[in-house]
Amino acid sequence: MEPSHSNTGQSRSVDRKTVEKNRRMQMKSLYSELISLLPHHSSTEPLTLPDQLDEAANYIKKLQVNVEKKRERKRNLVATTTLEKLNSVGSSSVSSSVDVSVPRKLPKIEIQETGSIFHIFLVTSLEHKFMFCEIIRVLTEELGAEITHAGYSIVDDAVFHTLHCKVEEHDYGARSQIPERLEKIVNSVH
């Protein structure tokens, strides 16, 4: 009985060694992948693993700060643009204490045509976000457009949708109907 017990102990020891070896190989692979994502280090001498990890952590923190700055800049630009639009419509009585980050009269749509590509910008309130799905349905099912890009962003109570679609060059009838049909959908809410 004693010999079988020692074989089991050796087997467990080998299993642990194999597991540890696999773990080290996996960690080495993960470290390599992490370091490959960093901008190249200008130093000629290679960094130690702890230095590489510190550099990765610092780089991630720097990216987080940049993202937060860009979000703040976006919020400011949206507020500025909205204020300019409100003022250009003749709403000069807006006081500075009013939150202008969301346009007062929603939804709004802007359509730009570049050849057979339409760029559609839709701003809705959170309660009217269904309108985006309706616009996609009308474009694809009724007008035969092909959606090439769709996305949205939520800022405060506004949803900013962007949509790019392609209509065949020879299908002028559908192309001419797009602005009219989409504005009809948007204006049905007012």
UniProtKB/Swiss-Prot annotation:
| Domain bHLH: from-to ranges | 11-63
The entry's keywords: DNA-binding, Nucleus, Transcription, Transcription regulation
Q: Which domain of life is it from?
A: Eukaryota
Does the UniProt entry include the keyword Transit peptide? no
Q: Which GO terms describe its biological process?
A: defense response to fungus; regulation of DNA-templated transcription; regulation of transcription by RNA polymerase II
Q: Name one GO molecular function term.
A: DNA-binding transcription factor activity
Name where it's found.
Nucleus
Task: Name any one Pfam family assigned in the record.
Answer: HLH
Tell me which family the UniProt entry assigns to this protein: Belongs to the bHLH protein family.
| The protein's name in its UniProt record | Transcription factor bHLH162
